[in-house]
Amino acid sequence: MLIRNLLCLLERVAAEPMSGEIICYSPHANAGYCSWSYTQLLVEAQRASHALESTHGKALVPGSRVLLHFTSHWDNIVWFWAVLLAGCIPVMSTALPTNGFLRKAHLEHLARTLINPLCLTRAVSVSEFADQDAVNPIVIESLDLAKPLGPSNNPSGSRKHTRGLEDTAAVLLTSGSTGRCKAVCLSHGQVLAAARGKLDALPPADESFLNWISLDHVAALVEVHIQAMLARKTQIHVPAPYLVSQPTKLLDLVHAHRVSRTFAPNFFLARLREALKNCPTTTANENLNGATSIRADQPSRWDLSCLRCINSGGEPNKTRTCQEVSEALAQYGAPGNIIVPGFGMTETCAGAIFNQHCPRYDLDHQLEFASVGRCMPGISIRISAGLNSNQPVPIGQPGFFQVAGPVVFKEYFNNKHATTEAFTSDGWFKTGDLALIDERGHLSLTGRSKETMIVNGVNYDPQSVEDAVNEASIPGLVPSFSCCFSCLPAGSETEEICLVYLPTYQKDDVAARVETTASISRVVMMAVGVLPQVIPLDEAHLQKSSLGKLSRARVKAAYLRGEYNAQRNLNHDLIRAFRRETRTAPENEFERDLLAAVIDSLGPLDEDEFGVDTPILDLGITSIELIKLKKDLEASLRLHRDIPLITLLTHPTVRDLGTALRKLQGTQVYDPVIKLQAEGTKTPLWLVHPGVGEVLVFLNLAKFIKDRPVYAFRARGLGGDDERPFTNISEAVKTYYTALKHEQPNGPYAIAGYSYGSMLAFEISKLLEANNDRVSFIGSFNLPPHIKTRMRQLDFKECLLHLSYFLDLMTEARARELADELRDCSRDGALETVMQNASPTRLAELALSSSGLLRWANVAFALQSMAVDYEPTSSVSGLDCFYCIPLAVVAASKQQWLEDHLAKWNDFTRSPVRFHSVGGAHYTMLSPEHVFDFQKTLRRALENRGI
């Protein structure tokens, strides 16, 4: 028989014996649980519906909305069905804001949107509706719920049969881009199609469903309650606090109730992992690729052989977390693919796309965040070229994620504008996410289209900034309680970046406040290139949803309303006072002049806060600003000789720099090693310069690597006219090898080169291995093993043009045009032509003269000339190749570059090469807009090599 609506489903299941039961745990600690059969649920719902109709029948017009505001699962379940039996539409209320102003505004918005709905609640919650008149709650204790049902007062008769599959069954609330919720209409047909699709995609065993999130979330309502009913299975509902405080209780419940399916977002999985590490019955060990394995010492504690699926969504799932939790649970009998990341929204009736091959698929494809998988029946997906575009992009290309199908909603209640905006002209729902579909049909989310922040013309995803802050493990910040957004201050022409967070320190611990602010600022500066507005807030201002998510839209709206002004001003005043009190003053006139020159060059800086011991690089300055500082200091201090950039890099404070500058008049000895980053205890990372010889290109990258020291090799010849370039590869390799062993006598070693530097890194690694040293990581940044053909193309003029494009003095297209013009020119003529065609603004930014460019080009040409007959020989233990869009002269596409050129590294390694696709092109892969994603890929590759 066709199920016409949800009420038909309830009646049919209630009439079947042994169709399962509903178990609800009390919200009170140690109060146990109660259970009801589906037959008892129907009776309770009929009684509640009759009591409501008896008292408020005139207001219960068919199709009218009834807001359900309850804290217990059982209340929500009973009254959901009671309202349906009354011919009305249940609206599941979310938790009300604790802030009085926001709560009133929210209720007024609901009253307008839902057109004066009835509201049901318990007496214990009625105080939440104080100080407002928009929504007047009905206390269910005032209804006559004890009256027995008879044929004359049974509400399950005619009304349920008038509702068809297209009619609205329920309304759920979801946050919109302005912070105001939208009301999502879920039809009977949509909900039933979604439940069937989930059962088809992930068939349950003969066990039960476990839910621990509130019924206002679509996953609890549809993915557990309705789906379990359709499957004739038992469902268990547990209050979230019962589990969040003690994550292993989830396993206790699975074991006790023989649960086959449950739900856990990434934040809970991370907590479960940590709880298992510290559990008396387990031991945590680090495996070879750096991941933590958790071994069960007493496997009998939990029998998880019943567990088939832990759905996970609502936030990105880290592959490593999925791997570690899966391995831990497998110790107790769970299958290896127990974690099922997925995608779902209120508009799609919760999860509709599932990754059933996690973490194996994601590890094989080297995904930092797990794929969300493939579609269940009832939904189709596409990636479009634009937000409103109907044109799909090719497989593997990111774009705007859209969905369609029977499980997708049709409208927002009483909001035609939002409904129109939500769909494309051909009827596909715009999810607001950015994503791509890989060659196997797996979907991966890459960001949110509406939350993009634009900084200096570059788009950034605020989620990636929050991830960076959380990954930094800052002591003064509660993990996952940070929120990043951008806004345009009044009177400003550019957006500012804001980050609010929940602190761990006491309010009067100013030193911790200052250190936390500085740490957050450094991370954000590294991610987006500008200093953020950092504001600590209390937990009342950072309320999470039932899935543990902070609403960025709501937080941003509160900031724009000025609700955080007091906290911002207090934080600013305390930090400023602390820095003034602890500032180190100059000791002599030279330090005073040098400090003033630095402040003038890098300003605006507060002279009362920036002292001689303040690290200059902590300001997050770019390589361009570093070069500007060099020229400004040379001019203001009237030094007799240029300041080498190496001096600025290796002497990061005014005091250190002053000492170095006093010695500048003496004889300089070439040292190839530049220490870019000194923090961390992991294996140091050594970076070899590209073909231009300089290491400035690594500055952006080094900022992100705080868990290990970062060194770079700088070519000889850049320090002045007295410093001669290398004459052959062997000389360079031996020089770098000797310097490396002096700085790091023992392995394991990690070394990588950018472009030309990859060849030198390969040769240095061979020399290390020949001397019985272990090289755990060798990286090639976009260079194949065979390079002599390209090197022979690069005469002095080509090197000069190559350098000019690398320094952004001109475009690649203009450099190619000049190549023909300069063919018969002398060196001096070529240099003059390049200077004439170079961007004057860029030359000024670099403070680059004709003689300076000539010296640089001579070094670049010397390096290229060394490799015109280079042939790779022998092999290394392994290699990681990071590849991007190639130069136009070497390959027509990224895929051709990989298959025809880079893949040949496999001929020179004793294990398969690991290839990593990264963003950008050959000259931009480490630029500010790409370096954040690049460093994540690099750090993951280092971890996977066991270092």
UniProtKB/Swiss-Prot annotation:
Pathway: Secondary metabolite biosynthesis
GO MF, one annotated term: phosphopantetheine binding
EC class: transferase
Region feature (Thioesterase (TE) domain): 684-934
Keyword presence, Metal-binding: no
Alphabetical list of Pfam families matching this protein: AMP-binding (PF00501), PP-binding (PF00550), Thioesterase (PF00975)
Catalytic reaction list: 2 3-(4-hydroxyphenyl)pyruvate + 2 ATP = atromentin + 2 AMP + 2 diphosphate + H(+)
Single biological process term from Gene Ontology: fatty acid biosynthetic process
Modified residues (O-(pantetheine 4'-phosphoryl)serine): 623
Domain text: UcdA has an A-T-TE domain architecture. The adenylation (A) domain recognizes and activates the aryl acid substrates, and loads them onto the thiolation (T) domain. The thioesterase (TE) domain shares the missing condensation (C) domain function, and is responsible for condensation and final product release.
Protein name stated in the entry: Nonribosomal peptide synthetase ucdA
Species for this entry: Aspergillus ustus
